């Protein structure tokens, strides 16, 4: 039997000692957690293991011995290591040995009890698998440590080999913390053995941050209570608070600080990641704000900005005056209503004159305003950007007024024209029913309405032109403010901590693998297929998992096959038989369908037409075009593999569904055919000729672009290698090619059908 031993990479170079870990009998694997070094007192070791078992609910024990020497272990050391098995009895007893500076490992697993079967070896083969203990513990590959009783039982029963490793390492944190600050009576080596000084500093920082966070949380709660006072909810203050971007950003930053200095512990890793991202975002914001503050107060840049701000405002006002004078003439050669054009132009020019006077009155205070705005950058760059957005809104307030005037005037014109157009057509708007109804008007009403409609229609181009110009100016200001708000939102929501982990430590963002989740009650648990030979001295990637990690394409293919099986109903007049022994509740629909893979050659007609099969789909497998077909229930008869399937090669028509002149004789020689029954039904056979305790399989051979594999493909193991097949009795070997044109080296392609699932 092959045993799997998961060994931490942090213990590869440690001194000799005992292997402390957990034995998983369901997976025949041992998870090594730490190395216990000499010298030690056995009673203290047993007390430590008992405390760890009680705190973590993990069966931690001494699994074996670890020998790390400069050369082969001496005879006395070997006898001493063997004698430790009597002090710490465990079955099996692991013995791992490595030469210092070498790459050769010696791995043994012995049983002190007598072998159960005669001739069985007393030692098992060991497959050594290295894992990074720190990465496994810091990642989210393990299951939650706190689960309800009902979920904990189901989770423990469904965990596979890798999930058991993740769960064991995660729940054994008590063992890793036993010697964080000092070595103690027992000296262990694990992932935290070399970080005692860092652990002490981290513990001191954690204890010092508790009172500080409590004090800051109290101050923030006081500020929140003051801001929620009813005085700030009165009309002027509430209106200004909802319109100013600075107030919104300060409120948002207060929520962030409350979350950061909260003394409540994070319930799950998602909340912890959110809190860490918030801390990183606030630190980045404050750092950028301090950089802006130092830049503004250096070399009297605030005075230069104040001196340049008033001339810029005057220049903008002059450009607006030139634009209005251009509109009061003949803009772009358009004929405007001169009276209305002059009224609107002078109205807007008067507002610009008022705005220039207001700017000149505020010019002595601009430098002081900018100085206080620069001080606000110590709260963060986002606060300074929000203040800049509010300043832009105040400096362009006249443009906003122009846009509102033009929009209201244009809206009145449009509504008036729509009402007069309904009057002109003899219609009216019914306010109660919210619809347009017919209405009879007098002659004077029609005359006045038609006259007003004509006047408004001729005045519409002038109003529309002013509305269009001021709308474009307003859009320009809104675009600038939108860019500023976009930058503020980017700084507030930037997951800087997650990005740093993704670049530096991507294992911290890993989640539980979906392949290790339960597949359902009707499906067997995933199994690991291991090569029969020993893996000592071989690289770990040679241990090929079978059935535990399926590709996405295989998962989708299995889902499609299950959907097709679900649409196959039992035939009329037959009752559903009871479950046969060894089939694990095999469904009736699966017993009513037989699947096969057939080739589609380039120079002829495929053989599935001759056999009357229903094509399900086609795909490319191993560089060979293949089609998946279904044989209906009336074709499901007792079958056996034969080298030929048609009389063109076999000399007799043993299969009535294959014609005499097969269009593709070479392909027919590659197919395991279905033969009519030649014996009566006996006990142990289902009504459709499926032998109980066996799995259905059809093999197809054909050319392969890669190197031909061994006689038995690793994806088609025998019943002894794959216990989930329900007791497979038939040996799935490639069928001989038979006569016909020569083909390249045959390559076995198998479709295996197990109870409750279909696996390629």
From Swiss-Prot:
Pathway: Glycolipid biosynthesis; glycosylphosphatidylinositol-anchor biosynthesis. Keywords: Disease variant, Epilepsy, GPI-anchor biosynthesis, Membrane, Transmembrane, Transmembrane helix. One of its GO terms (cellular component) is endoplasmic reticulum. Residues 696-748 are annotated as: Disordered. The gene is PIGQ. One of its GO terms (molecular function) is phosphatidylinositol N-acetylglucosaminyltransferase activity. Part of the glycosylphosphatidylinositol-N-acetylglucosaminyltransferase (GPI-GnT) complex that catalyzes the transfer of N-acetylglucosamine from UDP-N-acetylglucosamine to phosphatidylinositol and participates in the first step of GPI biosynthesis. The chain crosses the membrane at residues 278-298, 349-371, 378-400, 446-468, 475-497. This is Phosphatidylinositol N-acetylglucosaminyltransferase subunit Q. Disulfide bonds: none annotated. The keyword Cell cycle does not apply. Its main location: membrane. Belongs to the PIGQ family.
